[in-house]
C-alpha cells in the first residue's frame, strides 16, 4: 500500500510549521509522487509514518484500510467550513469501493446520511449493511461522461433532463428539494458534471481522484450562481490519519477486507480490479 511521507526537515513553507502539512511543497506521497514506492515485500519507513495497529485486527486487516480511510477522513473533515456535521446528506460515489466504504462508515458515525451510488443491487445492499441510509443504482441513468456543449440545445437539454431525473432519485431519499450537502467525488470525468449540478447551494463537491479520467467538465453557471465549492483533497495529515485510525480502534469503522492475496497473486488482483470484477471492499496482499 502507499505510505505517507512527511517532511523530515524544517521548511520555509509556513504550511509545514503549524499550517496544513499537506500543502507543504516538500510533501509527497511515497510511490505516487516519488519514483520508488512501497510496493514490495519489505520496506523501511520512518517513525512518523507509523500509526498504532488496532489490537483486535489481524495484520492483513490492519494493512488494508489506512490509505482509503485517511483520504476519506480528510475529504469529510479537512476543508472547513464544509466539514461533516450531524444530519447532513452526503452523496458517495462508488459506495462499495475502498473510499466509498470508508466514507459511508464515517458519515454514519457522525450521525449523517450517506447515499451510496453503485453499479449493482448487490453492492447497494452491502452499502446499506455498513451504514448507508440508501443507495442509487447508477446503471438506471444515462447522464455520464463529459458535459455536452451548452450551445447544443438538443443534446444539452436531453442530458439535463436525465441529470434532473437522477436528482429526483436523491430527493426520494432526502425529501423534495433537499440536495446533498457534500458530494464525495473520485470517479472524475464520468461523474463530475452530475456532482456539480446535484450538490446543494453553498455545498461542496470534494474530490481526491479521477479514476475514470482527469478531464473534468461542469456547467459553471450552476456553480457560481449557486455558490458551490469544488475542493481538491489529497490523502491526509498525520493528525487526520491518527484520528481516522482511532475510529477503527474504537470499532466505529470496520476495515471491510474481503480477500487476501499471496504476493505472487498480485497480477490476478490487478486484473480483477481492472475488469471491475472484484468483490466489494478492501484487499490485502501478504
Predicted region positions:
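Short, small-residue-biased leader/transition segments that mark boundaries at the very start
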Residues: 2-11, 286
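NAD(P)H dinucleotide-binding glycine-rich loop of Rossmann-like/cofactor-binding domains
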Residues: 12-94, 140-143, 150-152
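Hydrophobic/small residue at the entry helix of a nucleotide-binding pocket
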Residues: 71, 98-99, 190-191
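Helix-to-beta-strand junctions that scaffold the AdoMet/dcAdoMet cofactor pocket
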Residues: 85, 199-200
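NAD(P)H cofactor-binding loop motif with strongest signal on the N-terminal glycine-rich segment
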Residues: 94-95, 187
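Adenosine-nucleotide cofactor-binding segment
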Residues: 108-190
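C-terminal hydrophobic helical "lid"/dimerization subdomain
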Residues: 193-197, 238-284
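Rossmann-fold dehydrogenase core element
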Residues: 201-208, 218-257
Amino acid at each position: 500500500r502507499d505510505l505517507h511521507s512527511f517532511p523530515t526537515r524544517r521548511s520555509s513553507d509556513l504550511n509545514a510549521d503549524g499550517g496544513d502539512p499537506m500543502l507543504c511543497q516538500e510533501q509527497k506521497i511515497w510511490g505516487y509522487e516519488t519514483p520508488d514506492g512501497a510496493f514490495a515485500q519489505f520496506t523501511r519507513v520512518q517513525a512518523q509514518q507509523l500509526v498504532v495497529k488496532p489490537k483486535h485486527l489481524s495484520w492483513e486487516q490492519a494493512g488494508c484500510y489506512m490509505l482509503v480511510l485517511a483520504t476519506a477522513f480528510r475529504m469529510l473533515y479537512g476543508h472547513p467550513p464544509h466539514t461533516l456535521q450531524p444530519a447532513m446528506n452526503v452523496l458517495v460515489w462508488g459506495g462499495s469501493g475502498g473510499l466509498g466504504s470508508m466514507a459511508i462508515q464515517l458519515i454514519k458515525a457522525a450521525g449523517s446520511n450517506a447515499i451510496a451510488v453503485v453499479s449493482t443491487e448487490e453492492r447497494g445492499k452491502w452499502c446499506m449493511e455498513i451504514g448507508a441510509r440508501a443507495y442509487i443504482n447508477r446503471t438506471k441513468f444515462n447522464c455520464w461522461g463529459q458535459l455536452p456543449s451548452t450551445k447544443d440545445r438538443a443534446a444539452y437539454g436531453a442530458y439535463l433532463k436525465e441529470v434532473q431525473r437522477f436528482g429526483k432519485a436523491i430527493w426520494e431519499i432526502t425529501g423534495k428539494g433537499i440536495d446533498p450537502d457534500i458530494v464525495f467525488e473520485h470517479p472524475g470525468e464520468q461523474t463530475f458534471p452530475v456532482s456539480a449540478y446535484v450538490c446543494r447551494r453553498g455545498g461542496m463537491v470534494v474530490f481526491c481522484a479521477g479514476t475514470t479520467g482527469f478531464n473534468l467538465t461542469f456547467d459553471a453557471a450552476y456553480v457560481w450562481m449557486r455558490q458551490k465549492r469544488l475542493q481538491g483533497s489529497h490523502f491526509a495529515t498525520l493528525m487526520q490519519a491518527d484520528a481516522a485510525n482511532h475510529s477503527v480502534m474504537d470499532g466505529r469503522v470496520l476495515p471491510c477486507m474481503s480477500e487476501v492475496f499471496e504476493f505472487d497473486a498480485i497480477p490476478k488482483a490487478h486484473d480483477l480490479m481492472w475488469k471491475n470484477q472484484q468483490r466489494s471492499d478492501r484487499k490485502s496482499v501478504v
